[in-house]
């Protein structure tokens, strides 16, 4: 069995939330990592979540694998799109880098959404105006479901090939 976050569902939640945060209109960018299937699922989900808001345009989708690369990517995107309204980072490092880029671009109104939910990102959602939300993964639930599946298998019960864990949304304390 493969126990993992439902990355597509998390992306859909991020896209829907971005649509609400931008009141259905504006421009957004995506920092991605197209070599990873989990990230492709997140980005595809994000686009699906935005599909109900046709007045939001995706103006850039560029890779930024490490935090340093994501910072350069975010800076380049914001320089080319001075009035960028939103940015989806495929992971917390990409989103945290985008927060720094937004500060240096003096863009206090951009809405940034990340994905993973590590403590540093949740703290930044609490303290940074531009970091609007993070899609949270739940490794404790993944571990519990993996143990349950292993026990079921050892007891001769059928086990699903894929066991998705639904992500959550963190928008602050």
Each predicted region: which residue ranges?
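A residue-level marker of the well-folded mature domains of exported/periplasmic proteins
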Residues: 1-173
């Amino acid at each position: 069995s493969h126990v993992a976050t439902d990355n597509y569902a998390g992306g859909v939640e991020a896209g829907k939330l971005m649509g609400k945060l931008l009141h259905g209109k504006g421009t957004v960018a995506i920092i991605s990592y197209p070599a990873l299937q989990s990230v492709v699922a997140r980005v595809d989900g994000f686009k699906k979540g935005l599909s109900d808001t046709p007045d939001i345009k995706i103006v850039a989708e560029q890779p930024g694998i490490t935090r340093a690369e994501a910072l350069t990517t975010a800076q380049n995107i914001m320089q080319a799109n001075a009035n960028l309204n939103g940015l989806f980072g495929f992971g917390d490092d990409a989103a945290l880098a985008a927060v720094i880029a937004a500060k240096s671009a003096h863009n206090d109104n951009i809405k940034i959404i990340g994905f993973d939910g590590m403590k540093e990102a949740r703290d930044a959602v609490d303290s940074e105006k531009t970091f609007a939300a993070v899609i949270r993964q739940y490794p404790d639930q993944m571990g519990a479901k993996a143990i349950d599946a292993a026990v079921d298998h050892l007891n001769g019960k059928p086990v699903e090939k894929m066991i998705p864990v639904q992500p959550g949304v963190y928008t602050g304390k």
